[in-house]
Structure formats: C-alpha cells, structure tokens
Amino acid sequence: MTQQIKYKRVLLKLSGESLMGSDPFGINHDTIVQTVGEIAEIVKMGVQVGIVVGGGNIFRGVSAQAGSMDRATADYMGMMATVMNALALKDAFETLGIKARVQSALSMQQIAETYARPKAIQYLEEGKVVIFAAGTGNPFFTTDTAAALRGAEMNCDVMLKATNVDGVYTADPKKDPSATRYETITFDEALNKNLKVMDATAFALCRERKLNIVVFGIAKQGSLKRVITGEDEGTLVHC
C-alpha cells in the first residue's frame, strides 16, 4: 500500500553538528550513513529533496569571530566547511544508489557546480537530491538563512529543520523536565513566546514567504518519514 505524502518538495536543513554523532568534531561514518539512509527512504517515496548543510562540525565562523579573527574571513571558512559536508553527503547518497548533486554558492568548479536556480529545480524534478553548499555565499548570514532562501527559491512545500531535539518546546527540555512539545504553533505565537526556532533573518523570510517549518529530531529513527506522511512528529510552525 502506497503511503500518502504530505509534502512533495522539501528543503531539509541539516546542522553540521548532526553529522558528528558521538564524536567531538568531524563526520561520524555511522551517523552520516544513518542520516542519508533516512533521507533516501523518502526520496524513494517520490519526495523531491533539497538539503542545506551547516559546517559547525568542522568550523564555526561565529565562534572564531569571538577571538581575534575577522568575522567575514571566519564566515568564509565556515562556508568551505559546509562544502566538505556536502561532498560527504553526496558520496553517501551515491553509495546507496541515489543520484545527488552539489551546488555551491561560492565558485568551486573542480568539485561542485556553482549554484543556479533553474538547474537545481531541474535536478529536483528529475528525482536527484540537491545539496546546497557554502550558505548564501555571503558572510554574516547563517545556514538557517541559506535554508530559508533556497526553500523559497525552490518553491518548496515546507522547510524541515533537523535538530537534536524532537520539536519546539515550552522550555529547554534538557533543563526543565516539565517542558512540553508543541505539535503546532503559528509564526506569531513563536515570536510572542520568544521561542528560538531559528535565527531572526531566516524566520522572517519563512514567515514572509509563507514557508512553513517543521522542527524535528533527525536522530530519531523513522522521524523524517513520519513528518513526510503527516504523522505527529516534531513541531509544525505555520502561518
């Protein structure tokens, strides 16, 4: 029996840290295999998937800027870290027989295509996974903002923000055991309650473009598929 798909085209935001697993930094082999396996499952269901990946497992521009490094330089280094993660994801997809393409917002023609919206949309329509690397290509913008931007440009049905927590809570569940998860919440409610769904620029862009967000825990087996089929998984932030 074919399962009903709630979202046909999605933009998945993966943090670099989500690829570390239990390691202190870098890419954990078992973790990336599990993550890519979860994504491959929805690709085989016919879902078109674009991915924006962070680079915090390799280099965090904001942290470096707290020292003596110039912020723009640190951000460019962070962008290059996202390219490394994107290439690792592409390789993992192709190992599973899933066609994937890396498009970089910075020109790196020897290792990745330069971002081009029409080509990216074509790839999605062909069933290929498109991995968007190097953020927006500009310093001072987070990969959350890059995800919101690419999600809007690709005309995605939803933005899926994969985190280490299985949704948006009334308080930090690690600090407050009485915290409860929101099943759904509006953009305005999230703002009024000062819930940190993502950075303000990304949140504002999603709200303006009416691009709903689902926050969910990627490490929870089957969670991505449950989001796609409309089950109670994570938190839906909507207009």
From Swiss-Prot:
Residues that bind UMP: 55, 75, 136-143
Keywords attached to this entry: ATP-binding, Cytoplasm, Kinase, Nucleotide-binding, Pyrimidine biosynthesis, Transferase
Main location, first listed in the record: cytoplasm
Gene Ontology CC annotation, any one: cytosol
Enzyme class label: transferase
Domain of life of the source: Bacteria
Pfam families: AA_kinase
MF terms in GO: ATP binding; UMP kinase activity
Subcellular location: Cytoplasm
Protein name: Uridylate kinase
